[in-house]
Amino acid sequence: MGRGKTPNLGEFRVATDQSASRKISQFCVRLEAKQRLRFNYGLTERQLLKYVRIARKTRGSTGQVPPQLLEMRLDNVIFRLGMASTIPAARQLVNHRHILVNNRIVDVPSYRCKPKDIITVRNRPTSCNALKGESPGGGETPDHLTASLSEGSRPTGLVNRIANRESVNLNINELLVVEYYSRKA
């Protein structure tokens, strides 16, 4: 059997591994931190930019404010309380008007919860059915929230205080995110 026109498929060229020898730029490090934060909370670029701009205007550490604001979003609070298995599922519960904050219907997932807010599920059969298939998300409830998921009654959550750095268990350097957006000002 000769070599003919068909190429020998057993041979292939080994590509040189340039990624190991190439130095990662500071821009790349900042972009990765920003993307990790963005995808973890399911935000668009514009939403995250809005939170960074709010953080710049506040007093205190600019890097710590965006994670605090993101942790206090209604969709994230519902996820952390265990009422939804994922943040997108929590967003859907809010959008479909299944959630009450202080006994008022809130259908905006980006609603910023405040301390002493009481989050409950509407007293409708469809609202209760929406939660039946959900399993507790994230394991333990953070210390800035209190959950009561007792059988027979509606699931209820209470926001005790504003989230702090310890309750946000992300391995992200928030200052890198702020530095990334310092170019966009």
Swiss-Prot record:
Pfam family, one: Ribosomal_S4
Keyword set includes Isomerase: no
Molecular function per GO: rRNA binding; structural constituent of ribosome
PROSITE patterns, per the entry: RIBOSOMAL_S4 (PS00632), S4 (PS50889)
GO cellular component: a single term: small ribosomal subunit
GO biological process: ribosomal small subunit biogenesis; translation
Subcellular location: Plastid, Chloroplast
Region Disordered: start-end pairs: 132-154
UniProt keyword list: Chloroplast, Plastid, Ribonucleoprotein, Ribosomal protein, RNA-binding, rRNA-binding
InterPro entries hit by this protein: Ribosomal_uS4, Ribosomal_uS4_bac-type, Ribosomal_uS4_CS, Ribosomal_uS4_N, S4_RNA-bd, S4_RNA-bd_sf
Record-annotated S4 RNA-binding domain positions: 72-134
Record function comment: One of the primary rRNA binding proteins, it binds directly to 16S rRNA where it nucleates assembly of the body of the 30S subunit.
Quaternary organization: Part of the 30S ribosomal subunit. Contacts protein S5. The interaction surface between S4 and S5 is involved in control of translational fidelity.
Family: Belongs to the universal ribosomal protein uS4 family.
Official protein name in the record: Small ribosomal subunit protein uS4c
